[in-house]
From Swiss-Prot:
This is Peroxisomal biogenesis factor 19. Its main location: cytoplasm. The modification Phosphothreonine is found at T236. The modification Phosphoserine is found at S35, S39, S54, S66. One of its GO terms (molecular function) is peroxisome membrane class-1 targeting sequence binding. A lipid is attached at C296 (S-farnesyl cysteine). The modification Cysteine methyl ester is found at C296. Residues 25-63 are annotated as: Disordered. GO terms for biological process: chaperone-mediated protein folding; establishment of protein localization to peroxisome; peroxisome fission; peroxisome organization; protein import into peroxisome membrane; protein stabilization; protein targeting to peroxisome. The gene is Pex19. Keywords: Acetylation, Cytoplasm, Lipoprotein, Membrane, Methylation, Peroxisome, Peroxisome biogenesis, Phosphoprotein, Prenylation. The keyword Transmembrane helix does not apply. It is a lipid-anchor.
Amino acid sequence: MAAAEGGCGAGVEADRELEELLESALDDFDKAKPSPAPSPTISAPDASGPQKRSPGDTAKDALFASQEKFFQELFDSELASQATAEFEKAMKELAEEEPHLVEQFQKLSEAAGRVGSDASSQQEFTSCLKETLSGLAKNATDLQNSGMSEEELTKAMEGLGMDEGDGEGNILPIMQSLMQNLLSKDVLYPSLKEITEKYPEWLQSHQESIPPEQFEKYQQQHSVMGKICEQFEAETPTDSEATHRARFEAVLDLMQQLQDLGHPPKELAGEMPPGLNFDLDALNLSGPPGANGEQCLIM
C-alpha cells in the first residue's frame, strides 16, 4: 500500500514539472512574437519632425509657388528673385501715385492665387494680366514701331537714369520719363516752330481750294501749335520740378488736341525731322481704343 502511494506521488510530481515546462515554453514563445506596429492615426508626432500644416499655410505655399513659377518663366532664373523684390517695391511707389492701377494689380494678385491646372482659372489670370498691363505694353509696342530713327530714339531715352546696376525695374517711371523726353522742347519745338511760322501763308494760299470744315481744322491746328511753342518758350533753367510737370501736362493736353484735329498738310508736315513725320498716332497719346480722356496715358 505504501509502495502504491509512493508511485502515485511520483506521478503527480512529474505532471507538475511537465506543466511548468510547458508554461515556460509558452511564455518564451509569447516573448519571441513581434509586437504589432503602432497605428499611424494615434501615434504622437515627433517633436523634431514636421508639424501638421493648416489649410491656410498650404494655400499660401501654393500661391508663392505659383508666383515663383511665374517669375521663373517670365525672367531668367537668376533674375526671378530680384524681380519679386522689385515688384513689391514698385507696388509701394505705385500706391502713392496711381491708386487705380494698384486696384488692377490687386485683382491680378487675387487671380494669381486662384491659378490652377484647369483652363478656366488660367484664362482668368491671363485676362487680368492683360488688362493690367495693356496700357504699358501698348505704349511700349507703339514706340518701338513708330518709325523713329535709332539716333532719335536714343536721344529720347537720354536722361532716364538707367545706369548699370540701378536695378529699379519699375516700368512706370521709365515710361513717364520716356514720354517726357519725347514731348520735350528739344524734340518737338524746332519743327513745330517752323510749321507754325509757315502756316499763315499756307492757309492764305489754300483758303479757296479747301472745304470750309477742313480749313477750320487747319486754323485750329495752327492755333494749338502756337500754344505748344509758347509753353516751350516759357521754359527757364530755374524752373522747379512742379513747373516742369505742369508744363509737361499742358503740352500733353495740347498734343492730344492736335491729334484730334488730324494731320497737318503734307506740304508742312514734310518739314518734320525724318522718322517722326508728325505721326502722333505712333505715340499712342490717346491710349488703347475705347479709353476716355482721363485714361489716355498712364502718368
